[in-house]
């Protein structure tokens, strides 16, 4: 055995290295303390303290090296086979990388744990407890307590075998400790960069395929083929025990991820995972030159396939069970026969065969039969039955003819048939009637006023009184016309009509045809919409307008006469006798026409009937108009001019006239006063 200081170093060196590791970032110190705590748990002092504290170790929480090396293979296969579990497997790989860090540093911290004093072990245990409190937040307390007991039992036996192999591992751990110190310093500088690259790193880790991992393992095997020594029995036993625990830890992580459904990674965990990734990459590059490290690692990888293949076979069904829970399997596809195999729902009645009553075949509903006694009616309908739709000019009297109750048709009334059509008023001629009479032997027989004659050519004709109608036979389409007999509120079928008969008048000379044409003519003739009436009298409005026109003409004529007479008087006073005065008829006839009054006529009238003129002057007739007053003034004026008796007689007459006028005016005024007094 070599010198202990050469193998393990002095205590000063170990304390200096511990200070360097403590001065690192919180994430690095947590990782180193977790790694040293996981290896120190193999010692007896650690076992005693763990028994006193009752807290789970880092191995119980994170597993061993073999778990971390084997888990990527399983997670890679799961990623390749089932893409639906990418999120849960990405979280598994993240936890695997976190576990790789303490596995790479296990051997280094183990040598320091044996050489340090009990005080140092106490400090490391305190750090381990802090690290466990940080990292154990992802696991439930129930899982930690249950798994702690099972892992303690396993690792108690394994740690005893590991103690004998510590001497051999210490030599290999010296070189790794030196590289670890440099790695820690580099990790502090790259911690910030790794936080930024976290999202891309997680995706890259989740998408690693099995081929990439196999290539990496083959390259490492090629590098370590020349320097590979034979592995010790203790290492193989430790690897086997690691392989046994690996599926358990991976199952625990899967259960945790499935329970969480959406894994939530804290900032501290992300920093741990990024730092551990960096350490893995740099430790692998350092191990390329370090042959002894690679030898131990490759021996473990060579020993894994035999056991890990068995474990992978057992783990694949578990993953498949997870996907089966999410998406279902081929057995869940329902077929047409599944409904028969389904168990009956609780509370549903079940028959003797075990089938629900709803699925039983529906029994035919029995017919309801009601027994009713109806008298049987036998009718002798003859050999042939015909369906007849009577035309407008034919009618049938169903009751037998009786002269006592016979009512003739009235001209004023309208005959309507059963369908509401207006019948032609043919009176007795076109109505089919029948009656009962006795023959010569005294037997009652039926007699009718109509008969059907069948001719030799097969045609038929109906003779009704003196009228003859042609009968046409035609088949009926479909069995839709039946003969029924009314039985109370029901109908009893008797026969089915197969043929129908139609009737038409035989000739246009028959009375029936003439009445039909007349009725049609009356129906189709257009009534005169506008009637012109003769004027019985004259229009009063027209008469009124004519009277107004005549009155206007009379007024114009009177105005012309007055104007002419005024001019004549003025001329007479100035010149005396003139031609117009001496011969007035010549000018009057030309200018005034028939209505004008000549001076000669006035003279003759004055000479012939002075009294009449006076009576008219003194008359109070209201019918005399203004023209008569004017004419009277003219007469007076001319009388004065033509009077040869003198002015005395004229004055006398004027006074008489004035007196008469005054008396008349007084009478009128007295009447008005009386009316006002009333």
From Swiss-Prot:
Disulfide bonds: none annotated. The modification Phosphothreonine is found at residue 200. Residues 1-14, 115-128, 164-178, 191-204, 586-595 have a biased composition (Acidic residues). GO terms for biological process: endodermal cell fate commitment; mRNA 3'-end processing; negative regulation of myeloid cell differentiation; positive regulation of transcription by RNA polymerase II; positive regulation of transcription elongation by RNA polymerase II; stem cell population maintenance; transcription elongation by RNA polymerase II; Wnt signaling pathway. The modification Phosphoserine is found at residues 10, 14, 66, 161, 164, 173, 182, 190, 209, 217, 224, 232, 241, 250, 258, 266, 289, 291, 306, 308, 312, 619-620, 622, 626, 642, 670. Keywords: Acetylation, Activator, Nucleus, Phosphoprotein, Transcription, Transcription regulation, Wnt signaling pathway. InterPro entries: Leo1. Residues 70-97, 105-114, 129-163, 205-230, 237-297, 559-573, 648-660 have a biased composition (Basic and acidic residues). Residues 1-373, 559-596, 613-678 are annotated as: Disordered. The modification Phosphotyrosine is found at residue 618. The modification N-acetylalanine is found at residue 2. The keyword RNA-binding does not apply. GO terms for cellular component: Cdc73/Paf1 complex; nucleus. It is found in: Nucleus. Residues 32-43, 328-337 have a biased composition (Low complexity). GO terms for molecular function: RNA polymerase II C-terminal domain phosphoserine binding. Component of the PAF1 complex (PAF1C) which has multiple functions during transcription by RNA polymerase II and is implicated in regulation of development and maintenance of embryonic stem cell pluripotency. PAF1C associates with RNA polymerase II through interaction with POLR2A CTD non-phosphorylated and 'Ser-2'- and 'Ser-5'-phosphorylated forms and is involved in transcriptional elongation, acting both independently and synergistically with TCEA1 and in cooperation with the DSIF complex and HTATSF1. PAF1C is required for transcription of Hox and Wnt target genes. Component of the PAF1 complex, which consists of CDC73, PAF1, LEO1, CTR9, RTF1 and SKIC8. The PAF1 complex interacts with PHF5A. Interacts with TCEA1, SUPT5H and CTNNB1. Interacts with SETD5. Belongs to the LEO1 family. This is RNA polymerase-associated protein LEO1. It comes from Rattus norvegicus (Rat).
């Amino acid at each position: 055995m070599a010198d202990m200081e050469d193998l393990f170093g002095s205590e000063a060196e170990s304390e200096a290295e511990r200070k360097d590791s403590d001065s690192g970032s919180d994430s690095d110190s947590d990782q180193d303390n977790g790694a040293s705590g996981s290896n120190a748990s193999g010692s007896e002092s650690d076992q005693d303290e763990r028994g006193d504290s009752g807290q789970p170790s880092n191995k119980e929480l994170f597993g061993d090296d073999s778990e971390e090396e084997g888990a990527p293979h399983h997670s890679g296969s799961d990623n390749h086979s089932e893409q639906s579990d990418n999120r849960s497997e990405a979280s598994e790989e993240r936890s695997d990388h976190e576990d790789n860090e303490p596995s790479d540093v296990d051997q280094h911290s183990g040598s320091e744990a044996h050489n340090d004093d009990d005080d140092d072990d106490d400090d490391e245990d305190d750090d381990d407890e802090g690290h466990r409190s940080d990292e154990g937040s992802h696991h439930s307390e129930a899982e930690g307590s249950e798994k702690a007991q099972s892992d303690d039992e396993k690792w108690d036996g394994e740690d005893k075998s590991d103690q004998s192999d510590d001497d051999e591992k210490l030599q290999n751990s010296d070189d790794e400790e030196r590289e670890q110190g440099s790695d820690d310093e580099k990790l502090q500088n790259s911690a910030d960069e790794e936080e930024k690259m976290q999202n891309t790193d997680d995706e890259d880790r989740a998408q690693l395929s099995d081929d990439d991992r196999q290539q990496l393992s083959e390259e490492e095997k090629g590098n370590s083929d020349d320097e590979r020594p034979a592995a010790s029995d203790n290492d193989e036993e430790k690897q086997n025990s690691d392989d046994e625990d690996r599926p358990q830890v991976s199952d625990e992580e899967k259960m945790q991820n499935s329970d969480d459904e959406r894994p939530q990674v804290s900032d501290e965990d992300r920093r741990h995972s990024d730092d551990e990734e960096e350490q893995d990459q740099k430790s692998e590059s350092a191990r390329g030159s370090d042959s002894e490290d690679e030898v131990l690692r490759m021996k473990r990888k060579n020993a894994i396939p035999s056991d890990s293949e068995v474990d992978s076979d057992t783990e694949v069904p578990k993953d498949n069970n997870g996907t089966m829970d999410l998406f279902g399997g081929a057995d869940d596809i329902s077929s047409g026969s599944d409904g028969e195999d389904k168990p009956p729902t609780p509370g549903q009645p079940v028959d003797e065969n075990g089938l629900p009553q709803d699925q039983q075949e529906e029994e035919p509903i029995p017919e309801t039969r009601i027994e009713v006694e109806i008298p049987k009616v036998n009718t002798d309908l003859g050999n042939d039955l015909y369906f007849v739709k009577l035309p407008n000019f034919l009618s049938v009297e169903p009751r037998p003819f009786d002269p006592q109750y016979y009512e003739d048709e009235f001209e004023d009334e309208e005959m309507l048939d059963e369908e509401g059509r207006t019948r032609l008023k043919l009176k007795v001629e076109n109505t089919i009637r029948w009656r009962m009479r006795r023959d010569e032997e005294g037997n009652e027989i039926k007699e009718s006023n109509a008969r059907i004659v069948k001719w030799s050519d097969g045609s038929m004709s109906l003779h009704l009184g003196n009228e003859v109608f042609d009968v046409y036979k035609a088949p009926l389409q479909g069995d839709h016309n039946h003969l029924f007999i009314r039985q109370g509120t029901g109908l009893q079928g008797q026969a089915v009509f197969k043929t129908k008969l139609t009737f038409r008048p035989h000739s246009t000379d028959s009375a029936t045809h003439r009445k039909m044409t007349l009725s049609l003519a009356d129906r189709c003739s257009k009534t005169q919409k506008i009637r012109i009436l003769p004027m019985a009298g004259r229009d009063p409005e027209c008469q009124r307008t004519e009277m107004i026109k005549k009155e206007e003409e009379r007024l114009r004529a009177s105005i012309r006469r007055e104007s002419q007479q005024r001019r004549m008087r003025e001329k007479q006073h100035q010149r005396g006798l003139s031609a117009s005065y001496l011969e007035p008829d010549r000018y009057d006839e030309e200018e005034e026409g028939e209505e004008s009054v000549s001076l000669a006529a006035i003279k003759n009238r004055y000479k012939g009937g002075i009294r009449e003129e006076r009576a008219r002057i003194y008359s109070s007739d209201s019918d005399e108009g203004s023209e008569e007053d004017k004419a009277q003034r003219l007469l007076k004026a001319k009388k004065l001019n033509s009077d040869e008796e003198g002015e005395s007689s004229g004055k006398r007459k004027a006074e008489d006239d004035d007196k008469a006028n005054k008396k008349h005016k007084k009478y009128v005024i007295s009447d008005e006063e009386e009316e006002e007094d009333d």
